């Protein structure tokens, strides 16, 4: 009996130098059921992409025939094949012959070479493949016109030739010593349960009762839309709904058919880091017509959908609300025409609409931010930072045009974040007659002070007070008139591109989850909501009112009522505009306070460095100098003051370019005033400080408390003092946000994206990423949410063996559902102090051991890289906002003392007096100077900016041992993260 040439083929390579033959061979094998898993075209690819590629290949396609393997049922009720290394009996001695639970997989590499090839036609290459469906394969080959060649080998059924002339043989025997296999069901283990007709009927009935939700992305694309799609899909599935993607915006709703597709849990894996929207977006003309909305209604009812989550701008949301209002008439019309049944009419007679604002313009009223706005702002400041380098080198001026249509939010915030000299926005247009002169004065004044570059931001909707457009060309001409070498840069659609920033991932995720909850809680009497954010709080606003108020802004601008337009923007818009003027325009001397009210303000950095220390110092300095105050930098923390008396007065030119500088220009460390309180008091008296701003983390908070507690012994500390939290750990009591934490999260999101890419390339690798944060789990919780981590370990939620077992079960289930085809990497996030026992290395080791060859684990520790380099847009904007509020706090407290006619000069200096022998604060009039509320921590809590006395925080709201506040304000992030990773489903089960 002749022996087969190959009995256990797993990989082979076919080569040709004929391009047409290459394509024909590719088509031949795909018709036989092979799938393309990798393609290569000769170009300048990096080395890691060339692994396995032949050096003389012009083009390669790798084809794979996935093995028949053990079938298991997933938690979602789907049946998937297990990979070889997960099958029963893998690595056992029995597998040396063949696995009874998995056939061999095959990889074919097709190569197009640039070399001359000489093939022996008399002795062509020959390979043998196994198939469990020999008759179907024979029929398929006959169908495509392939030659059937009888075999002389007993174990080989027949042969054929591929277009390259290679002989391909087929056998029903997996190996020489095995028995003949005639059905793929042989490999289905355990055996598939035969379902009764009754069970099928019950399933149909149960599915009919499920809420069906469609998700649409409409209008201009925005970074973060994919995160919203992911959140809506997984939250919907978690809450027992069926979720459909409506492709190409409202166009898909009108066309129906394949444009409405149900989404499964794994369909949205890996979307967090992808910009734009994978389900497409379009501005639909058809949906604007009633017939289009009627057809959309029919398509929704036909699919059983009566809830719509719309992610788009004001136009998209307006269309959605109109659709809801017309729905009763539309569905009644469909019933009358006989297109739907009475049962369908009764079931879907009401439409639920929930809006998510996805727009880079941030032009929707009733919310602080829209999905995509801060990613766009991040792109702008990144590009302007690059421009700054060449502008300073050549002493040039740059006019930068940004998007925003009729909203100046991008223009205003980019002006603040980039340290621009001047901005043009539609809400606050300059005088038609004076703007050119005003622009010249500001730019020349800054040049005279020593600035080498000039930056002017122009919003695309910029106008003057007579509604005449102001173009970038006009601005350039004005700057040229004063002798500046000027260039125009239009950033254009690059502002929409790229991966979403950390905040937009967070915003889209939590709003997407709340949108599903809003759908389930909705009744016909509840107006359609739009999910918004005010400070750090997710709220629901009436969609109609938000859209109407947004349109009112445009109407106010058209009516030249610019004050009204400014007020109609979000609550901080007008304040931010004033903040910009205070650091860019008011240095002209027009805002100087009387000499008797001028102060000496000290600024000190305490604790670990973060990226936002310098921007906050810059704004506090420029704002104070504009009013005539003197600003002193205490260098190298309290250690520098105590040891060297390191105090330096800051001038305008010293700080003007600190807006994009990370670290600390004046130096920082963890030293505290308690090291030598007397010396600290001495230097405070020497420089006659009237106020102190301490910028830093928990050490800054501790330093403020120590200074406050020392007031009884050192009256100089009775000055108003403010702690501005700036730490990546976000562990300062009294605030839910700290400067520098957003930069850290952006850095972590990029780091984890890279790690996940590495994990996805190897398919079977999981990374355990260790993040900083001390005993505060904020950073880990937030990072887990925005990176799609399977599990997050924090100090607030103790780790035990059961927790780890559940997470390994989730990991195993995820790999099962991927079936080796999904490229999304898996990561765990582990806080550095989460557990003394279950460390990062131990968690990784446990995962690796539990994998037993099915998957492996690695650790990744970004360390101090997390602090970031250049501050993020959010940190720059908030540094400006909070630093100015700190300055105002110091000014107000001093005003009450210095202008109190009932106090003597000494009492004003001491800031207290004795009333019938009782020591009384000159600020508050309270009987104890310690309780006069002039030692405070500024913070964001809920939807408010607060000033909280440090003593109150220290005594009531601080966990001293763990160096953090008692309020775990980020706990909701863990719940949402667990819900979307599948972790919550396992624990619920």
Swiss-Prot record:
Residues annotated as coiled-coil are: none
Q: What is its EC number?
A: 2.7.1.11
Query: Where on the tree of life does the source sit, at the highest rank?
Result: Eukaryota
Residues the record lists as binding beta-D-fructose 2,6-bisphosphate 1? 670, 727-731, 772-774, 832, 864-867, 963
Activity regulation information from UniProt: Allosterically activated by ADP, AMP, or fructose 2,6-bisphosphate, and allosterically inhibited by ATP or citrate.
| Region described as C-terminal regulatory PFK domain 2 | 600-989
Instruction: Give the residues annotated as active site.
Output: 361
Keywords, comma-separated and alphabetical:
Allosteric enzyme, ATP-binding, Cytoplasm, Glycolysis, Kinase, Magnesium, Metal-binding, Nucleotide-binding, Transferase
Task: Check the record and name the InterPro entries matching this protein.
Answer: 6-Pfructokinase_euk, ATP_PFK, Pfk_N, Phosphofructokinase_CS, Phosphofructokinase_dom, PKF_sf
Pathway involvement?
Carbohydrate degradation; glycolysis; D-glyceraldehyde 3-phosphate and glycerone phosphate from D-glucose: step 3/4
Q: Where in the cell is it found?
A: Cytoplasm
Write down the Pfam families for this protein, in alphabetical order: PFK, Pfk_N
Q: What cofactor(s) does the depicted protein rely on?
A: Mg(2+)
Q: Which residues bind beta-D-fructose 6-phosphate 2?
A: 396, 487
Which residue stretches belong to region Interdomain linker?
586-599
One GO CC term of this entry?
Answer: mitochondrion
Among PROSITE patterns, the record links this protein to: PHOSPHOFRUCTOKINASE (PS00433)
Q: Which residues bind beta-D-fructose 2,6-bisphosphate 2?
A: 765, 858
Region annotated N-terminal catalytic PFK domain 1, chain positions:
1-585
Can you provide one Gene Ontology molecular function annotated for this UniProt record?
Answer: AMP binding
Known partners and oligomeric status: Heterododecamer of 4 alpha, 4 beta and 4 gamma chains. The gamma chain bridges the N-terminal halves of the alpha and beta subunits.
UniProt function note: Catalyzes the phosphorylation of D-fructose 6-phosphate to fructose 1,6-bisphosphate by ATP, the first committing step of glycolysis. Involved in the modulation of glucose-induced microautophagy of peroxisomes independent of its ability to metabolize glucose intermediates.
Family to which this protein belongs: Belongs to the phosphofructokinase type A (PFKA) family. ATP-dependent PFK group I subfamily. Eukaryotic two domain clade 'E' sub-subfamily.
Name the record gives this protein: ATP-dependent 6-phosphofructokinase subunit alpha
């Amino acid at each position: 009996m002749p022996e087969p040439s190959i009995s256990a083929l797993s990989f082979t390579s076919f080569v040709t130098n004929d391009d047409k033959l290459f394509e024909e061979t590719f088509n031949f094998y795909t018709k036989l059921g092979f799938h393309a898993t990798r393609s290569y075209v000769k170009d300048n690819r990096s080395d890691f992409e060339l692994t396995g590629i032949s050096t003389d290949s012009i083009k390669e396609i790798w084809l794979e025939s996935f093995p028949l393997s053990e079938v298991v049922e997933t938690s979602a009720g789907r049946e998937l094949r297990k990979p070889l290394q997960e099958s029963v009996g893998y690595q056992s001695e029995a597998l040396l012959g063949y696995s009874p639970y998995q056939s061999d997989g095959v990889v074919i590499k097709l190569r197009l070479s640039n070399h001359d090839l000489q093939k022996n036609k008399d002795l062509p290459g020959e390979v043998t493949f196994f198939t469990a469906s020999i008759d179907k394969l024979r029929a398929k080959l006959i169908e495509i016109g392939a030659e059937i060649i009888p075999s002389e080998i007993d174990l080989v059924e027949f042969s054929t030739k591929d277009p390259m002339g290679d002989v391909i043989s087929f056998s029903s025997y997996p190996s020489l010593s095995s028995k003949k296999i005639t059905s793929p069901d042989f490999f289905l283990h355990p055996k598939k349960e035969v379902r009764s007709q009754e069970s099928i009927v019950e399933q149909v009935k149960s599915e009919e009762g499920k809420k069906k939700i469609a998700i649409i992305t409409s209008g201009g694309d925005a970074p973060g839309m994919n995160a919203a799609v992911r959140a809506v899909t997984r939250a919907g599935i978690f809450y027992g709904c069926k979720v459909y993607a409506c492709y190409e915006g409202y166009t898909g709703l009108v066309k129906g058919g394949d444009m409405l597709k149900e989404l499964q849990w794994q369909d949205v894996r890996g979307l967090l880091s992808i910009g734009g929207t994978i389900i497409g977006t379009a501005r639909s003309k058809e949906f604007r017509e009633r017939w289009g909305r009627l057809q959309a209604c029919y398509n929704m009812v036909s699919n059983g959908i009566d809830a719509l989550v719309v992610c788009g701008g004001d136009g998209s949301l307006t269309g959605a609300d109109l659709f809801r209002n017309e729905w009763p008439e539309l569905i009644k019309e469909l019933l009358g025409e006989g297109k739907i049944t009475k049962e369908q009419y009764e079931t879907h007679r009401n439409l639920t609409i929930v809006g998510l604002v996805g727009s880079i313009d941030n032009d929707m009223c009733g919310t602080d931010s829209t999905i995509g706005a801060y990613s766009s702002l991040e792109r702008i400041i990144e590009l302007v930072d690059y421009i700054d380098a060449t502008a300073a080198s050549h002493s040039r001026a740059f006019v930068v045009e940004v998007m925003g249509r009729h909203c100046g939010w991008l223009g205003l915030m980019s002006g603040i974040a980039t340290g621009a000299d001047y901005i043009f926005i539609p809400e606050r247009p300059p005088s038609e007659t004076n703007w050119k002169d005003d622009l010249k004065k500001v730019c020349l004044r800054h040049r005279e002070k020593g600035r080498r570059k000039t930056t002017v931001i122009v919003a695309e909707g910029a106008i003057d007070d007579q509604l005449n457009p102001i173009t970038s060309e006009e601005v350039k001409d004005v700057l040229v008139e004063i002798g500046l070498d000027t260039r125009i840069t239009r950033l254009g659609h690059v502002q929409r591109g790229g991966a979403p920033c950390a905040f937009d991932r967070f915003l889209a995720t939590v709003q997407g989850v709340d949108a599903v909850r809003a759908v389930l809680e909705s009744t016909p009497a509840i107006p359609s909501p739009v999910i918004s954010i005010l400070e750090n709080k997710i709220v629901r606003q009436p969609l109609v009112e938000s859209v109407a108020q947004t349109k009112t802004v445009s109407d106010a601008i058209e009516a030249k009522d610019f004050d009204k337009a400014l007020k109609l923007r979000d609550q901080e818009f007008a304040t931010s505009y004033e903040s910009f003027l205070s650091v860019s325009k008011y240095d002209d001397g027009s805002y100087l306070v009387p000499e008797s009210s001028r102060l000496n303000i000290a600024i000190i950095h305490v604790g670990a460095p973060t990226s936002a220390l310098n921007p906050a110092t810059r704004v506090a300095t420029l704002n104070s100098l504009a009013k005539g105050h003197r600003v002193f930098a205490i260098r190298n923390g309290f250690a520098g003051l105590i040891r060297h008396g390191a105090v330096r007065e800051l001038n305008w030119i010293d700080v003007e370019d600190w807006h994009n500088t990370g670290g600390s220009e004046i130096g920082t460390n963890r030293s505290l005033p308690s090291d030598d309180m007397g010396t600290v008091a001495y230097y405070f008296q020497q420089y006659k400080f009237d106020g102190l701003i301490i910028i830093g983390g928990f050490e800054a908070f501790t330093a403020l408390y120590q200074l406050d507690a020392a007031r009884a012994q050192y009256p100089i500390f009775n000055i108003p003092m403010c702690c501005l939290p700036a730490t990546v750990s976000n562990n300062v009591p009294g605030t839910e946000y700290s400067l520098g934490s957003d930069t850290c999260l952006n850095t972590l999101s990029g780091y984890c994206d890279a790690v996940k890419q590495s994990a996805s390339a190897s398919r079977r690798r999981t990374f355990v990423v260790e993040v900083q944060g001390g005993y505060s789990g904020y950073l880990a919780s937030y990072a887990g949410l925005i990176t799609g981590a399977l599990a997050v370990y924090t100090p607030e939620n103790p780790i035990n063996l059961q927790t780890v077992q559940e997470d390994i079960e989730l990991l195993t289930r995820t790999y099962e559902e991927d079936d080796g085809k999904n490229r999304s990497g898996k990561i765990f996030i582990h806080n550095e102090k989460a557990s003394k026992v279950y460390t990062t290395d131990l968690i990784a080791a446990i995962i690796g051991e539990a994998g037993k060859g099915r998957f492996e684990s690695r650790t990744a520790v970004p360390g101090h890289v997390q602090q970031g380099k250049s501050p993020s847009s959010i940190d720059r904007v908030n540094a400006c906002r909070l630093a100015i509020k700190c300055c105002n706090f110091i000014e107000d407290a001093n005003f009450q003392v210095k202008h109190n006619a009932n106090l003597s000069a000494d009492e004003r200096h001491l800031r207290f007096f004795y009333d019938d022998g009782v020591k009384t604060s000159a600020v508050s009039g309270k009987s104890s100077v310690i309780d006069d509320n002039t030692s405070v921590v500024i913070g964001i809590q809920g939807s408010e900016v607060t000033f909280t006395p440090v003593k109150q925080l220290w005594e009531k709201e601080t966990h001293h041992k763990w160096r953090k506040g008692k309020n775990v304000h980020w706990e909701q992030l863990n719940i949402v993260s667990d819900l979307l990773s599948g972790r919550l489903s396992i624990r619920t089960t």
